[in-house]
């Protein structure tokens, strides 16, 4: 499974970004996933207009990704309608979203708790 690792913090906290990235990489390795890309950024969760998330989106649109791996759902966005729209975009392109801390998997079947 080809995964893109996405990390975000709202405020300058490089330790938190590093911790997220390490946790997600470890999870991917243990699951046998192939990490095809990773990005970590500082930015507001109140908008989807973020350079790091745009990198994820471009990989999704190019068909390079099977799953986006995040620490928690709020790393995508803080407002549910906006976050749901992004999840819908992923699913339209047959890409899953796995939130490891929340233990949520979003895919064409809906949402699964694992």
Placement of each model-derived feature along the sequence:
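Short, structured surface patches at the beginning of a domain
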Residues: 1-114
């Amino acid at each position: 499974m080809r995964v893109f690792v996405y990390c975000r913090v709202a405020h300058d906290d490089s330790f938190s970004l590093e911790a997220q990235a390490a946790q997600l990489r470890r999870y991917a390795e243990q699951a046998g996933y192939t990490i095809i890309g990773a990005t970590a950024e500082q930015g507001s969760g109140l908008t989807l207009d973020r350079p790091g998330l745009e990198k994820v989106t471009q990989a999704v649109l190019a068909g390079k990704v099977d799953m986006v791996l995040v620490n928690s759902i709020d790393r995508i966005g803080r407002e549910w309608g906006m976050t749901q729209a992004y999840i819908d975009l992923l699913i339209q392109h047959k890409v899953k979203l796995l939130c490891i801390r929340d233990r949520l998997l979003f895919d064409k079947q809906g949402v699964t708790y694992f």
